[in-house]
């Protein structure tokens, strides 16, 4: 980021709002932007055109004491999105910093709908009283129309710092990321051919996901190539009992090491009786008398 990268726009090409004073607020408060007149919008609508913001400049000019502290947060929202997803870009800068904020849109909107962009500000961690007219905001918009929407190269938001006592280390800004997309396969009558190499095309009764490696597939006994490429692709169709390899080698080894002798109660009694009798006989034998010579 460079505070000198962005040059002031040519006012002749921009729609300018009034430079109005705004009261300090800890809650998001709207900054009024000047959009094309109703007649201009109607003309574009009759020509079946859509519109986008090429460039938006928000000028902030502070009017607070020299010892004022706090941060100003400015946000651009797209009201076509749900409330928790409408934020598109935001800036944070010191309350005493005169600054120009630059935003470049990345989407078109239909003139049949209300203009979706809203601009808000709020002040955080400040020692200035609420409802004090702490600054003036002015917006400049450059819009364009097109017969139909096209992909717009992304241009990041930036700033132009006007107060010499502040630098790029004192400000911050961000932009929303691209929305994530996950393809959801369509189930259809024919789901047999998968992973086919060739142009992106489908046959009657097929979906594109069914013809790619992402879609689920039925067995294709006629395709030896698929069997070679994906030899285990249909194992999920087997029952869990067939896929269960059984107990591990360590468990089997422990079981083999354990004694596996079974005896009836009569056999156990006979074994004990015999062992006791042997002990008695061995301990009660009379010792032979030694002969005297």
Curated annotation (Swiss-Prot):
Phosphothreonine PTM positions: 221
Positions of post-translational Phosphoserine modification: 223, 250
One of the protein's GO biological processes: transport of virus in host, cell to cell
Membrane topology qualifier: Peripheral membrane protein
First-listed, main subcellular location of the protein, grouped into a coarse class: host cell
Any one Gene Ontology cellular component term annotated for this protein: membrane
Post-translational modification: Phosphorylated in yeast.
Keyword DNA-binding annotated: yes
Protein localization: Host cell membrane; Host microsome membrane; Host endoplasmic reticulum membrane
A GO molecular-function descriptor: DNA binding
Entry-linked InterPro entries: Gemini_BL
Keywords for this protein: DNA-binding, Host cell membrane, Host endoplasmic reticulum, Host membrane, Host microsome, Membrane, Phosphoprotein, Transport, Viral movement protein
Role according to the record: Transports viral genome to neighboring plant cells directly through plasmosdesmata, without any budding. The movement protein allows efficient cell to cell propagation, by bypassing the host cell wall barrier. Begomovirus genome is shuttled out of nucleus by Nuclear shuttle protein (NSP) and the movement protein transports the DNA-NSP complex to cell plasmodesmata and facilitates further movement across the cell wall.
Similarity comment: Belongs to the begomovirus movement protein BC1 family.
Oligomer status and interactors: Binds to dimeric supercoiled plasmid DNA.
Protein name: Movement protein BC1
């Amino acid at each position: 980021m460079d505070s000198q990268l962005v040059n002031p726009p040519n006012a002749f090409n921009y729609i300018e709002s009034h430079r109005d004073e705004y009261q300090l607020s800890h809650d998001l408060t709207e900054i009024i932007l000047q959009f094309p007149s109703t007649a201009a919008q109607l003309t574009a609508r009759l020509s079946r055109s859509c519109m986008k913001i090429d460039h938006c400049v928000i000028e902030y000019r502070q009017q607070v004491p020299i010892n004022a502290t706090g941060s100003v947060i400015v946000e651009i929202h797209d009201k076509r999105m749900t409330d928790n997803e409408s934020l598109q870009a935001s800036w944070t800068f010191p309350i005493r910093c005169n600054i120009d904020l630059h935003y470049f849109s990345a989407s078109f909107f239909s003139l049949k709908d209300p203009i979706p962009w809203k601009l808000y500000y709020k002040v955080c961690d400040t020692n200035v009283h609420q409802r004090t007219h702490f600054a003036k905001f002015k917006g400049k918009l450059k819009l364009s129309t097109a017969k139909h929407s096209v992909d717009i190269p992304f241009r990041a938001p930036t700033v132009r710092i006007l107060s010499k006592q502040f630098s790029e280390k004192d400000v911050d800004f961000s932009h929303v990321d691209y929305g994530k997309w996950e393809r959801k396969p369509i189930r259809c009558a024919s789901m047999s051919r998968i992973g086919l190499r060739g142009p992106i095309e489908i046959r009657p009764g097929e979906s594109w996901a069914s013809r790619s490696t992402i879609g689920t597939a039925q067995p294709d006994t006629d395709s030896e190539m698929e069997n070679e490429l994906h030899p285990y692709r249909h194992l999920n169709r087997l029952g869990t009992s067939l896929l269960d390899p059984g107990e591990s080698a360590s468990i089997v080894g422990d079981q083999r090491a354990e004694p596996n002798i079974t005896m009836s109660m009569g056999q156990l009694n006979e074994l004990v009786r015999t062992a006791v009798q042997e002990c008695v006989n061995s301990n009660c034998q009379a010792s032979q008398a030694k002969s005297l010579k």
